[in-house]
């Protein structure tokens, strides 16, 4: 285990390198930070840190920069995540509360994360496996046409126009609405297909033709939404400091075009309130070895409805980024949990 003083030296190196993007020397560290020791002692500590793989010397005459291992230790030893100011929290809450529906919540969240962190932001729509049906509405559009609207507990809305082979009126629409909500309201989306498929056989014969048609529309809505959806913003932020990515910028952009990669990065966030940080090779994606990912889950209670996070260079402001991701996730969870 590293001595406390060497941990302080490593912390100072990370903080200075994040700010300057320049290798850090022992003299500069001693001058800028209250380490309580001479530059010579700092130099010895830096040599020890280098031997243990926490920092490296990019050029013969240059200072040191953190390695993946150094960033990892820095993050693991953070005493606390830097809290956002009251004004910042109020601004986040106000911006998100202006959303009119789920799509708007996701769009605002991903834009806000990208702006706050100046990184690439990714937000997963609420996972179907975690969502349930809040209400199903059925209304007549004409003598042979119905509108079916399915609303989830997270605000997802699916609409289907249903054509009927037999005339339909408001009384029939009301009865269909009652049957569907009695069977499905409060049930998880993943359980709904089996329930819907069995409905026509348990309904009075006069209503069966209508219910068969509407049930088919409900099933179509559920099947078509099995693929998880994500939103992304801020890819232009990667070009702010191309030196951080050397020759890997193109491969990073190509990797971000793959939804399976994005889901791998943020979809594994299963708990709310817990921020995870994956650095370099920890992303398990070859093209992203020069990046870091900060992610968390959002939702009501301990289990996440979905994940969100940011991707940027390993040389990032980890305390500030973690605070921003946690704050946005908290407010999104509260917003989606409101009745």
Swiss-Prot record:
GO terms for molecular function: DNA binding; DNA-binding transcription factor activity. The keyword Transcription regulation applies. GO terms for biological process: negative regulation of DNA-templated transcription. Keywords: Repressor, Stress response, Transcription, Transcription regulation. Pfam families: HrcA, HTH_DeoR. SUPFAM superfamilies: GAF domain-like, Winged helix' DNA-binding domain. InterPro entries: DeoR_HTH (IPR001034), GAF-like_dom_sf (IPR029016), HrcA (IPR002571), HrcA_C (IPR021153), WH-like_DNA-bd_sf (IPR036388), WH_DNA-bd_sf (IPR036390), WHTH_transcript_rep_HrcA_IDD (IPR023120). Coiled coil: none annotated. HAMAP family: HrcA (MF_00081). Negative regulator of class I heat shock genes (grpE-dnaK-dnaJ and groELS operons). Prevents heat-shock induction of these operons. Belongs to the HrcA family. This is Heat-inducible transcription repressor HrcA. It comes from Frankia casuarinae (strain DSM 45818 / CECT 9043 / HFP020203 / CcI3).
